Every structure is written in C-alpha cells, then in structure tokens.
Amino acid sequence: MSILSALTSISNPMKSTKSSVANGGGRLSMGSNSVACGSCGGGNSSSGTINNADGSQTTYYSYTSPVYTYNYSYSYSSSGSSSCGCH
C-alpha cells in the first residue's frame, strides 16, 4: 500500500491532512500529514524515526496520550504506510 492510499483510506473524522508532492532534488515530499487517532489510554509519550535514502533521519510519529501524530517525508526510493492505533 502506498503512503498516499494509506492516508486516504483512513476513515477518521478527526484527521487533518496537508499534502504537497514536489520534486526537490530527487525527493518526494508529502509535506505535513497528521492524523488524530483517538485515545490509547495511559499517559505515555514516545516517538519513532525512519532512515531516509539520503542517510538522514525523519521523525515519523510522536505520541502523547491520547493522540498519535504522524509526519511523513519520503525519498523516491523509500516506501511506507501508516496506521492509526496503539502500537
């Protein structure tokens, strides 16, 4: 599943999406995509990173109960998908 179809297939009335696709020196930028995923209980917080094809790292989600926020910026040679929920 592509990142775009993954985002558009999430049916959540709380989601807000801002996307822009541009070729900036061989990079595909999805801009700022955030999804409010609802409560997961607890009061925890965490974040995750991905390694980009150019060697940089991108924080792709942060979680502070009760909301997950996902942010995507992928190069052409990378792929990924998103999902809402408690991981």
UniProtKB/Swiss-Prot annotation:
Family: Belongs to the hssA/B family.
InterPro entries: HssA/B-like_chaperone, HssA/B-related
BP terms from Gene Ontology: sorocarp development
Region ranges (Disordered): 1-24
Signal peptide stretch: none
One Pfam family named in its UniProt record: Coiled
UniProt name for this protein: HssA/B-like protein 8
PANTHER family given in the database record: HSSA/B-LIKE PROTEIN 1-RELATED-RELATED (PTHR31059), HSSA_B-LIKE PROTEIN 1-RELATED (PTHR31059:SF5)
Bias (Polar residues): 1-22
